[in-house]
A protein has these predicted regions:
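Extracellular carbohydrate-recognition regions
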Residues: 1-23, 179-180
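Short tryptophan-centered beta-strand motifs in secreted/extracellular beta-sheet-rich domains
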Residues: 7, 67-69, 129-145
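Secretory/extracellular carbohydrate-interaction modules
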Residues: 12, 46-112, 171
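Hydrophobic beta-strand positions in extracellular immunoglobulin-like domains
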Residues: 71-73, 138, 183
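Short, aromatic/His-centered strand-loop micro-motif at the edge of beta-sheets
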Residues: 112-133
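Short, solvent-exposed beta-strand-to-loop segments that form ligand-recognition rims
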Residues: 146-171
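Extracellular carbohydrate recognition
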Residues: 170-180
């Protein structure tokens, strides 16, 4: 497994260096590196409000591989989501897998031409104010999503193909912390 990317060397109150942050749809995302409440380590926090805020690592180009992140849903009246994006071409074209503490489920979507479409969702316990790990393994049309080590979605889909960036994602008014972002190429 690759060494997880942390935000401990990034400036507090700013987006992380080497990442591009924005949103699909309307709104104003607020991606900043902050000191974890009650702790000393720095984490990435999304605290703005937008349809689908995302923040992608600039130097990634994965066709087949895996993406993993630790996320901590803090609050949100509409949503309390944390997710990962991959095969990200731009803010309107990518895959996303997310877990939602308000709905207690894990979902897989493709976003094409700025329109998010559900591929699959499954009920799963997602506690608020707790760190979780979300991982996606993808190779060709195969996509496997796991929450806290348990596979929740395992299917085939071909909506988004070819290499793309990877990063993190939230929804609506979710206030979510992210840490230990990791990624790698698929094995043989």
């Amino acid at each position: 497994m690759a060494e997880p990317i942390t935000f401990d060397r990034d400036a507090v109150g700013q987006p992380p260096a080497g990442w591009t942050c924005g949103a699909t749809g309307k709104g104003t995302p607020q991606w900043t590196v902050e000191t974890e409440p009650g702790g000393t380590r720095r984490v990435l926090k999304q605290s703005g409000r937008a349809a689908f805020p995302w923040c992608v690592k600039n130097d990634i180009a994965l066709t087949d591989g895996w993406v993993e992140v630790r996320f901590h849903p803090i609050s949100g009246r509409e949503d309390q989501a944390g997710g990962v994006v991959w095969r990200w071409k731009d803010g309107d074209n990518y895959y996303v897998a997310r877990a939602n503490a308000l709905e207690n489920n894990v979902s897989l979507y493709h976003t094409t031409a700025g329109s998010r479409q559900t591929i699959e969702y499954r009920d799963a316990p997602v506690a608020k104010n707790v760190w979780h790990t979300l991982r996606v393994d993808f190779k060709g049309a195969s996509i496997r999503v796991a929450l806290d080590g348990k596979v929740t979605i395992d299917l085939q889909d071909t909506h988004i193909q070819g290499a793309g960036k990877a990063g993190v994602w939230t929804k609506a008014d979710s206030v979510t912390l992210f840490d230990a972002f990791a990624y790698g190429n698929a094995g043989p």
